[in-house]
Amino acid sequence: MPTFWENLIRYPRFFISSTLGLVFIITGPLFNLLNKPKSALLFAIIVFGILSGLLITLLLMLDII
């Protein structure tokens, strides 16, 4: 029975390490884009556009504007 609990404890650790690995794999190329000034500017504009679009959408959905 102790091996059952040991195996059960391994699953959350596996999930966390797999999720962190996936995040690092996805964000790695994005951080390489920040080394070039033109790519960094384009990346900043895209992120700003997405965040401002999300803000406007939420404000309109919540009838704040």
UniProtKB/Swiss-Prot annotation:
The keyword Plastid applies. It is found in: Plastid, Chloroplast. It comes from the Eukaryota. One of its GO terms (cellular component) is chloroplast. Its main location: plastid. Keywords: Chloroplast, Plastid. Belongs to the ycf33 family. This is Uncharacterized protein ycf33.
